[in-house]
């Protein structure tokens, strides 16, 4: 700030017309020309207020609105020495305008208000004040979004002679960042929708191909900036209200710094920004960069080599290696979140101790893999049990089928051998008897083999080979081992009267048909475990039933033979 010295008083012999006016309030100047006003919004960017006691220009207190209305003229005021106009120097009225009038006037060079305005501009401009006429002196930039030209807005004239009209004052007074959206809306209306869509597509493709970033769309409701930051920090854009509240609280706590960048009343600005539908701009970005201690990078569509480089970066107070908060700026009015899918950034900047980005996702992945493996192992064990059960059932069915076929084959072989030994002279009754016995034995075998094939399999190897030698029977082949597990034949009834006498035993057709049945009594006296038979009691009942049936069949055959024999010739 430049402190201007006081103007020295003129010597006593000076022209009284050039003497400064006496102390006290100065009457308003005639509305003949544009006045000079010291305005601006208390931004500390060149706007200032005069010191009423010292007569020098000082800094305006922060967070205070610009003064309205004419300023009184105490001694040492700025306009006392800067705007002193000799009486009668103004030749005529001058129309009000927003730019300084040309120097000089009808009253002669150096004698009109032009010279005074030039001197005022030269003196006040050194303090950083923008001088205007008829409306006029405005300082301080207005907030705009990234990519906007930060044009300065003119505040209404204060303490001006012949200030601007009320319409101009109403237009000049407004929000600190309203020009951002006014200019953006005008630009959007002027752009072709097809061109905008094509640019957005190219922008998204360039970020994905060159940086590997993905643009995540945010809801367009005025809180898009806070939604994008919430998505970057919390992973959920619906937490934008929390982000906005923290940001506004941070701005209020640091009002002595951030108020320098606001042209309106800072408290009014904060209260307006607390609304959920109010847009955010670069002041909030800087606050959030400091609040989360993460840089904020803003990407926007552009041409050339900088198409995928951030157009603006806001840094925090402390430098670190954390991933920045990335947002994209679209159509000069909307923000989206730019996500790096290869690096986790959620939770960074929240001040959580020992927090590692992505560690929660890794733990969840490990738990999911472990659960999946356990489920897969249990499923495989169940499938193995099912396959094992089917294999056992298949083996039992195969063993049962082999035992049945082996026993039937043994019966066929024995019948064939008996036919060869019997010869053609044997009666037909023996063949019929053996056939019926074979059928009965087959039916009895099916019932017997339908029980437990495992018990029969225990006798796969003969435990008494000497028994086969005594009986005159050769051991069966391995394929017919199970067929010998039931030695008693149904053709040999245990209660038949034909075996009661020793003489009948030699001439019986059953004995001649089955020579091995002579040892039936010996075999029946042996333990069933020798043949692998544990259900011997059931077999005895079956054998007795078959014996009774055989006896009835033999009796019927004898009766038929008696009826068929012709009566003897009496002649």
Swiss-Prot record:
The gene is OTUD5. Keywords: Disease variant, Hydrolase, Intellectual disability, Nucleus, Phosphoprotein, Protease, Thiol protease, Ubl conjugation pathway. Interacts with TRAF3. The modification Phosphothreonine is found at residues 195, 507. Changing residue 337 to A: Reduced phosphorylation. Reduced ability to promote stabilization of BTRC. It comes from Homo sapiens (Human). The lineage of its organism: Eukaryota, Metazoa, Chordata, Craniata, Vertebrata. This is OTU domain-containing protein 5. GO terms for molecular function: cysteine-type deubiquitinase activity; deubiquitinase activity; K48-linked deubiquitinase activity; K63-linked deubiquitinase activity. It is linked to Multiple congenital anomalies-neurodevelopmental syndrome, X-linked: An X-linked recessive, congenital disorder characterized by central nervous system, craniofacial, cardiac, skeletal, and genitourinary anomalies. Clinical features include poor growth, short stature, global developmental delay, impaired intellectual development, microcephaly, hydrocephalus, hypotonia, congenital heart defects, hypospadias, and other variable abnormalities. Brain imaging typically shows ventriculomegaly and thin corpus callosum. Changing residue 494 to S: In MCAND; decreased mRNA and protein levels; no effect on cleavage activity towards 'K-48'-chains but not 'K-63'-chains; in mice embryo the mutation is lethal; no effect on phosphorylation. The modification Phosphotyrosine is found at residue 175. Residues 32-47 have a biased composition (Gly residues). Residues 273-283 are annotated as: Variable-loop. Its EC number is 3.4.19.12. Belongs to the peptidase C85 family.
